Design a protein with these regions (language model features):
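Helix-loop "lid/cap" segments that line or gate small-molecule binding pockets
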Residues: 16-25
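A short, Trp-centered hydrophobic/proline-enriched beta-strand micro-motif
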Residues: 41-49, 93
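Active-site-adjacent elements of ketosynthase-type condensing enzymes
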Residues: 53-61, 122
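A short core secondary-structure module
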Residues: 73-127
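Flexible, small-/acidic-enriched active-site or ligand-binding loops
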Residues: 118-149
Length: 267
């Protein structure tokens, strides 16, 4: 997909991370309720982690979910959330115990929909903020999500049914995200190679296609090598992830190399 439209793969990635959280960590009842809606496209969304004052420092988030009987009341703001405008549901990292030490022990993951999946009625307390403009990568929207006393029942919306596990769920989602970003890098690098090779056959100098000049052949060879190496790193990371093993190192290596390959081949 990324060979033709990288932003579209980004839309899928955010939705896949949402689905992964429920598939991997949700209760059986949550899986039965949410996953068919995610798979059919009835609902799509993403992973809401980042806040105005907490990016890479996930333990610094301020969005809270306070228990009130059988419900939670969510208050806070998320920002730079992919699919924030067009999406309708988000796996959202919150603090259920703001006083926990270390902070990660007080963090939980909740499924927060903009509207009731059954009636379609908007949820009071969930508001989409402004669309955030980017320099590029405009095919996927980014936005603020604002929670102002959003009330939802615990059984359906607290992932896994237990507090304090959200940090580990978020990290698991990021592993999948890194592999997806790496795959996107492969797509861009591969398309760059195809376009370069096609141009090398078409453009002529000194009476022959430039692809017959050794200097161009060396450049194309380097591009092809980067593509193949990136493919292997992505496949390795994906296999490790699919086996249920820890894949953060392999995913990080694949993301780094494939994104560099995309930049170098495109340049």
């Amino acid at each position: 997909i990324s060979e033709h439209w990288m932003s579209l793969a980004g839309i899928f990635n955010s939705h896949l991370m949402l689905a992964m959280v429920v598939e991997k960590f949700g209760t059986e009842a949550q899986k039965d309720y949410w996953l068919p809606r995610f798979a059919s496209g009835e609902m799509r969304g993403g992973l809401a982690l980042t806040e105005p004052d907490a990016g890479t420092d996930l333990q610094g988030i301020r969005t809270t979910a306070q228990r009130d009987g059988d419900d939670y009341v969510v208050t806070g703001t998320k920002t730079w959330i992919s699919n924030g405008i067009e999406g309708s549901v988000f796996a959202t990292l919150v603090k259920t115990d703001p006083q926990a030490d270390p902070p990660r022990r007080g963090m939980s993951m909740m499924i927060l929909p903009k509207h009731d999946p059954e009636t379609g009625a908007p949820h009071p307390g969930f508001r989409t903020g402004k669309r955030l403009e980017k320099l590029g990568y405009k095919g996927i929207d980014s936005a603020e999500l604002i929670f102002d006393g959003l009330r939802l029942d615990a059984a359906r919306h607290l992932v896994g049914g237990a507090e304090g596990e959200g940090f580990y769920m978020a990290v698991g989602g990021l592993e999948l995200g890194r592999i997806n970003v790496a795959a996107r890098g492969v797509g861009v690098a591969r398309r760059s190679l195809y376009e370069a090779a096609a141009y090398a056959r078409e453009r002529k100098t000194f009476g022959k296609p430039i692809g017959e000049h050794q200097a161009i052949q060396l450049k194309l060879g380097e591009m092809a090598t980067r593509v193949r190496a990136a493919e292997l790193l992505v496949e390795d990371a994906a296999r490790i992830y699919d086996r249920g093993e820890r894949s953060d190192q392999a995913a990080g290596m694949a993301k780094y190399f494939a994104s560099e390959a995309a930049m170098e081949n495109a340049a």
